[in-house]
């Protein structure tokens, strides 16, 4: 019985601690939904429209956009 109470208190404390130390807990969902709304109005802004490069195409080492891996400037 005592162990159960201690566990409940610990979980409640950790939950409160998580919400109290969150960086942007008040505006997080609002920003998420406004970005999603912007992407619906402007489909080009969506990251899902970016095409990955097939094997054998030239890729960039620093910003690879390959479907697989970027090895020696070519997608694998």
From Swiss-Prot:
Residues 1-22 form the signal peptide. Keywords: Calcium channel impairing toxin, Disulfide bond, Ion channel impairing toxin, Knottin, Neurotoxin, Presynaptic neurotoxin, Secreted, Signal, Toxin, Voltage-gated calcium channel impairing toxin. Residues 23-50 form a propeptide. It holds the Pfam family Conotoxin. Belongs to the conotoxin O1 superfamily. InterPro entries: Conotoxin, Conotoxin_omega-typ_CS. Its main location: secreted. Expressed by the venom duct. Disulfide bonds join 52-67, 59-70, 66-75. The presence of a 'disulfide through disulfide knot' structurally defines this protein as a knottin. This is Omega-conotoxin-like TxO1. It comes from Conus textile (Cloth-of-gold cone). One of its GO terms (cellular component) is host cell presynaptic membrane. It is found in: Secreted. One of its GO terms (molecular function) is ion channel inhibitor activity. It comes from the Eukaryota. Omega-conotoxins act at presynaptic membranes, they bind and block voltage-gated calcium channels (Cav).
């Amino acid at each position: 019985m005592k162990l159960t109470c201690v566990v409940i208190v610990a979980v409640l404390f950790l939950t409160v601690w998580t919400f109290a130390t969150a960086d942007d807990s008040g505006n997080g969902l609002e920003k998420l939904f406004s970005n999603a709304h912007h992407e619906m109005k402007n489909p080009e802004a969506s990251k899902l429209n970016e095409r990955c490069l097939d094997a054998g195409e030239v890729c960039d080492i620093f910003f690879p956009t390959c479907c697989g891996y970027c090895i020696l400037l070519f997608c694998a």
